[in-house]
C-alpha cells in the first residue's frame, strides 16, 4: 500500500482511512481567501455502504487500499444471500443480502459483475454503469400527457421503481443508470 497526497484524489479511488476502506465518490479542492487550502470529499465505506463527508488539509497524505476485482456471473438468490460463480474456475461465492443492498435492484440472472475483495475479504460488487431492464408495470399512456413534461413511475422486472417518460409502455426494455437509478434511454434491442 502506498501513501498519496489528497491532491491526487480521483473519483473511484479506494483509500484506507480511520480503520475502514473508502471509495471516493466526489471531491473538491478549496482555496479560501485566507488560510490554507483543503480538500472536501465524500467517501463511501466499502464495508457498510455508508457515505460520509471528510475534509483534509491539502498537505495530508492517505494510504491507498489494494483491492482486487474479479469478474463473476450472478446465478440466483437463495433467500439470505446472492450466489455468484467464477466464470473461469466455476467456484461459487455467496454474498449476504445486506452486503449487496440496493444494488440487488439491478441484478439479473446470468449478469456478469465485478466482485470486490480486499485481503481475502469480500466487500461487495461493482455494477456496470448502466443495465438494461424490462418494464414490468406502468400506467398506460393518456393522449396529451406530453405537454406537462413530467414522467410516470415504472416498476422494472427487478422491482426497481424508475420515473420514465410518458411514451414508455409495459414490456419495453430500458437502459437504467446504476449510480442513481435514473432512466437513460430505451435499449436498442
Swiss-Prot record:
One of its GO terms (molecular function) is translation elongation factor activity. Gene3D superfamilies: 2.30.30.30, Nucleic acid-binding proteins. GO terms for cellular component: cytoplasm. InterPro entries: Elong-fact-P_C, NA-bd_OB-fold, Rib_uL2_dom2, Transl_elong_fac_P/YeiP, Transl_elong_KOW-like, Transl_elong_P/YeiP_cen, Transl_elong_P/YeiP_CS, Transl_elongation_fac_P. It is found in: Cytoplasm. Keywords: Cytoplasm, Elongation factor, Protein biosynthesis. Its main location: cytoplasm. Disulfide bonds: none annotated. Pathway: Protein biosynthesis; polypeptide chain elongation. GO terms for biological process: peptide biosynthetic process. It holds the Pfam family EFP. NCBIfam families: efp, PRK00529.1. HAMAP family: EF_P. Involved in peptide bond synthesis. Stimulates efficient translation and peptide-bond synthesis on native or reconstituted 70S ribosomes in vitro. Probably functions indirectly by altering the affinity of the ribosome for aminoacyl-tRNA, thus increasing their reactivity as acceptors for peptidyl transferase. Belongs to the elongation factor P family. This is Elongation factor P 2. It comes from Lactobacillus acidophilus (strain ATCC 700396 / NCK56 / N2 / NCFM). The gene is efp2.
Amino acid at each position: 500500500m502506498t501513501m498519496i497526497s489528497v491532491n491526487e484524489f480521483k473519483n473511484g479511488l479506494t483509500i484506507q482511512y480511520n480503520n475502514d476502506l473508502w471509495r471516493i465518490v466526489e471531491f473538491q479542492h478549496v482555496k479560501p481567501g485566507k488560510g490554507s487550502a483543503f480538500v472536501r470529499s465524500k467517501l463511501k465505506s466499502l464495508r457498510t455502504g455508508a457515505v460520509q463527508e471528510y475534509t483534509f488539509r491539502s498537505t495530508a497524505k492517505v494510504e491507498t487500499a489494494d483491492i482486487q476485482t474479479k469478474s463473476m456471473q450472478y446465478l440466483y438468490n437463495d433467500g439470505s444471500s446472492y450466489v455468484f460463480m467464477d466464470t473461469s474456475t466455476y467456484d461459487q461465492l455467496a454474498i449476504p443480502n445486506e452486503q449487496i443492498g440496493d444494488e440487488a435492484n439491478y441484478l439479473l440472472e446470468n449478469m456478469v459483475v465485478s466482485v470486490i475483495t480486499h485481503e481475502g475479504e469480500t466487500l461487495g460488487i461493482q455494477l456496470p454503469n448502466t443495465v438494461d431492464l424490462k418494464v414490468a408495470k406502468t400506467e398506460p399512456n393518456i393522449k396529451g400527457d406530453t405537454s406537462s413534461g413530467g414522467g410516470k413511475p415504472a416498476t422494472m422486472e427487478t422491482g426497481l421503481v424508475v420515473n420514465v417518460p410518458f411514451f414508455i409502455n409495459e414490456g419495453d426494455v430500458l437502459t437504467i443508470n446504476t449510480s442513481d437509478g435514473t432512466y437513460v434511454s430505451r435499449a436498442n434491442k
